[in-house]
Amino acid sequence: MCGIIGYSGPRPAAEVLLKGLERLEYRGYDSAGIAVVTDKAYIESVKKSGKLNVLKTCLERRTTPIVGSTGIGHTRWATHGEPSDRNAHPHMDTEQSLAIVHNGIIENSDVLKRELLASGKSFTSETDTEVVAHLLSDAFKKTQDLVQAFVEVTQRLEGAFAVVAIHKDQPNTIVAAKNNSPLLLGFGQGENFLASDIAAFAEYTQRVANIDQERIVALSGDSVYITDFAGHPVDYEVHTVSWHPASVDSSGWSSFMLKEIFEEPQAVENTLKGRTEDGTVILPECDHIRDDLLAIDRVVLVGCGTAAYAAMTASYSIEAWAGLPVSVELSHEFRYREPVLNSKTLAVFISQSGETMDSLMAVRYARQAGVKTISVCNVMDSSIPKESHAVIYTKAGPEVAVASTKSFVCQIVVLYLLALYLGQLRGFRSIFPRQKAVCELNRLPVKLKQVLEIYESVRQLAHWMSDSRSILFLGRHAGYPIALEAALKLKELAYIHAEGFAAGELKHGPIALIEPGQPVFVIVPSPVGSPILHAKVISNIREIKSRGARIIAIAAEGDSAVLPHTDSVLRIPLTRYSFEPLLSIVPLQIFALELAADKGFDVDRPRNLAKSVTVE
């Protein structure tokens, strides 16, 4: 991991590569580098650990610029070896005739490395990538063709990978191999691109082709050639995407994350658009599996991190509105515990990027078990949608900040829609309550805008609490996963201890953490929507308040019962009980962002995190 860019064409390659790497920064990284085949037919490579600016400064200080029109670039997120200059990509062979960049993990790299060491090869890094560089170099010496070298080497590699290479003896050519790691082509006028993300080349073209699994690609400025791993030519399809570089511009905002939080009302509106009519839900994406959905008797929701919490949040609504039992699984645990699955199981996979490797592997596992699969993703034409029976896209737009915000709320909205759709198909409950739910669902964009009006109050609260070393979050019912997500956001951004608990679990252990001054956020259900749960949560608040905790409540407008027992109250508009979690998370997202910003941290690119986790 984490970001790849390749370019061949008339432009100065180094400039194109650096711009591409800038667009890939949001994916998270710890080092960066480029390699270019120069006009004098040798490869020049520069790589540095740290931020991209370190690499730029190094290039600016050179007495002679790197001149060449074909090259590759990489931002690295360490998986093998510490973040350092020597472990940064690109990596080269011993003769400095070949350079490669690589995303993924070569699972048998230790075995291959021992073979290479025994043959006299030496290594300058700790990475699995350098192993591939030596293998390709040896294969090229035999074949004198980089595509054929890849055909030979890919037979020996185990794991998920995207490897991209240049060779001084084929100066205008880039060759790449893809196996379960994101890689796509961009087609320009007399120039072509390779990248792990369209953001890397969207400034130049929106004509793209997705590369299938187990493919080798050779490109120059005026040609593209694709084979399978056996070297047999294969066809590909070019299409135009609607994606503008301005969508990843944070001008006028202090951070992408803040911009994206304020985009949530529009993102939810876009996600709902065209999917409801006269109180019913319309999901044409699922029409072709309608009969299968009528036959299901249970639902499994699968995701990682924030996506898993979106699944947990919506699971209550699926059970209530569709009358189906629901379980929520972590993608990386799902296929290793022999889950009981059959043809009457519906598995729904949630992933912002559509490339989360754990979730992709889980999709394949489910399909092999005869399960019908639906994916909920934000990135069009990504791997998980292509391998699912159906996909319902969130329409959040590009999300640049590593910590997910608008995608999270849109994932929940899509799952609400799916819950109502399944209820319609099954004739579960009467039409009237369902129509009321759809009507209130369509009011959420306006109510999200109202929540954003308390931004300044939340910012001041974060400043007041910036010295906190531990913060707890409590919720009940669908407020519980919101507590988990709020704690995750604080850990991701502010690097402090935070935990989310089901409020009813307090007396079973967590109450031991409460001491005078301990900050505790409590997500309070509305007394209108659920008076019983509201009373229970007020009881929980009183328990911890009596032990000296500092209570901050997220509560609906008009709820006066919280006032005597809390230190602060952040108000959300009154809405249907099922939808309260969607509004409750917004001030908690803002709080995490502002607390981290107050500490001086980069809220868009938190340490050690990647936007798209494409390795297991």
UniProtKB/Swiss-Prot annotation:
Catalytic reaction equation(s): D-fructose 6-phosphate + L-glutamine = D-glucosamine 6-phosphate + L-glutamate
The record's CDD domains line, in alphabetical order, gives: GFAT, SIS_GlmS_GlmD_1, SIS_GlmS_GlmD_2
Pfam families noted in UniProt: GATase_6, SIS
One cellular component (GO) term of this entry: cytosol
GO MF terms listed in the record are:
carbohydrate derivative binding; glutamine-fructose-6-phosphate transaminase (isomerizing) activity
Annotated catalytic residues: C2 (nucleophile), K611 (for fru-6p isomerization activity)
What does the record list as coiled-coil region(s)? Answer: none
Q: Which UniProt keywords apply?
A: Aminotransferase, Cytoplasm, Glutamine amidotransferase, Repeat, Transferase
| NCBIfam families, per the entry | glmS, PRK00331.1
- State the protein's purpose: Catalyzes the first step in hexosamine metabolism, converting fructose-6P into glucosamine-6P using glutamine as a nitrogen source.
- Protein name (Swiss-Prot/TrEMBL): Glutamine--fructose-6-phosphate aminotransferase [isomerizing]
